[in-house]
Amino acid sequence: MQLTFNDFIKMEEIDHQYFPDENVSPADEAYKWYLADPNSCVVVKDNSNVVAYVNILSLKEEVYNKVKFNEMNESQILVSDLELNKDKYFNYLYFSTIAIDENHRDIHTLRQLIDITSKKIIEIVNQGCEIKEVMADCSTPQGQKITQRFLKLKPFMKTSHNSMIHILSGDEFIELLHK
């Protein structure tokens, strides 16, 4: 499914339902991520409107570590921070946003989003990409619940912007996806 800039405007609106402005990636930058790497965004639509989405960023190792150790947050990530080199693609995977429109927050939408996301990641791994580590930065209790319950990522550290970094080894994550 091809996404448009208007889809990213809607995603930014969804973000503002939950996250403080300083933690929201601007639609124009998120759209650049998508244009550089179409695998970076998975959406659920209802009547052609985005109602839920996940940003899955393949980050350069040094950028990944800056996010992991609270030296940088999602809203500062630029398209130049993405790892697009085929030999290193998806080594350091960052779930930068998992968000569902407040009018569509139900288990069906969540399961659909997780299912589509899992299939996308498995498809990429089956093309020969090696995931070394997976990370999510959770700003809400709901995000922490999704990250821990469905993605099985483990709490790593609290950030200066009131969120919690969660991580999991790539091997553990791949094993989980195949269950």
Where are these regions (language model features)?
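Conserved acetyl-CoA-binding loop-helix of GNAT-fold acetyltransferases
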Residues: 97-100, 105-123
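Conserved acyl-donor/pantetheine-binding loop and adjacent beta-alpha core of acyl/acetyltransferases
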Residues: 55-97
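Short beta-strand micro-motifs in enzyme catalytic cores
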Residues: 40-42, 91, 161-167
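Catalytic micro-motifs at enzyme active sites that drive phosphoryl/nucleotidyl and oxygen chemistry
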Residues: 29-32, 40, 81-84
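Terminal substrate-recognition subdomain of acyl/acetyltransferases
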Residues: 1-3, 98, 102, 122-179
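Short, high-confidence coil segments that cap the C-terminus of an alpha-helix
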Residues: 39, 90, 127-131
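Alpha-helical elements of Rossmann-like donor-binding domains used by nucleotide-donor carbohydrate transfer enzymes
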Residues: 10-14, 29, 112, 116, ...
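Short amphipathic alpha-helix that is part of the acyltransferase structural core
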Residues: 1-28, 36-58
